[in-house]
């Protein structure tokens, strides 16, 4: 199923760690990125802007293949 705005997702640790996106930021990715659901708020090409609502942080951009949809 295609991911669209409003979809709940979780980052895949193995695909995010060591990626170009991770290297462009702090090398220690916070656990909430992998342990809490995030909501897709925008989509541009292969990238998703994800807002993690459990913590007061700005949204982050991740490639679509670095996340998995959470079954509702």
Swiss-Prot record:
The keyword DNA-binding does not apply. It is a peripheral membrane protein. Its main location: membrane. Keywords: Membrane, NAD, NADP, Plastoquinone, Quinone, Thylakoid, Translocase, Transport. It comes from the Bacteria. It holds the Pfam family NdhO. GO terms for molecular function: oxidoreductase activity, acting on NAD(P)H, quinone or similar compound as acceptor; quinone binding. Its EC number is 7.1.1.-. The keyword Transmembrane does not apply. GO terms for cellular component: plasma membrane-derived thylakoid membrane. It is found in: Cellular thylakoid membrane. It is an enzyme of class 7 (translocase). It catalyses: a plastoquinone + NADH + (n+1) H(+)(in) = a plastoquinol + NAD(+) + n H(+)(out); a plastoquinone + NADPH + (n+1) H(+)(in) = a plastoquinol + NADP(+) + n H(+)(out). InterPro entries: NdhO. Belongs to the complex I NdhO subunit family. NDH-1 shuttles electrons from an unknown electron donor, via FMN and iron-sulfur (Fe-S) centers, to quinones in the respiratory and/or the photosynthetic chain. The immediate electron acceptor for the enzyme in this species is believed to be plastoquinone. Couples the redox reaction to proton translocation, and thus conserves the redox energy in a proton gradient. Cyanobacterial NDH-1 also plays a role in inorganic carbon-concentration. NDH-1 can be composed of about 15 different subunits; different subcomplexes with different compositions have been identified which probably have different functions. This is NAD(P)H-quinone oxidoreductase subunit O. It comes from Synechococcus sp. (strain JA-3-3Ab) (Cyanobacteria bacterium Yellowstone A-Prime). The lineage of its organism: Bacteria, Bacillati, Cyanobacteriota, Cyanophyceae, Synechococcales. The gene is ndhO.
């Amino acid at each position: 199923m295609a991911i669209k705005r409003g979809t709940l997702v979780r980052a895949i640790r193995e695909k995010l760690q060591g990626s170009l996106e991770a290297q462009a930021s702090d090398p220690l990715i916070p656990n909430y990125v992998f342990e809490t659901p995030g909501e897709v708020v925008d989509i541009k090409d292969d990238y998703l802007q994800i807002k993690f609502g459990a913590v007061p942080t700005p949204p982050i951009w991740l490639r679509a293949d670095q996340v998995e949809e959470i079954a509702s």
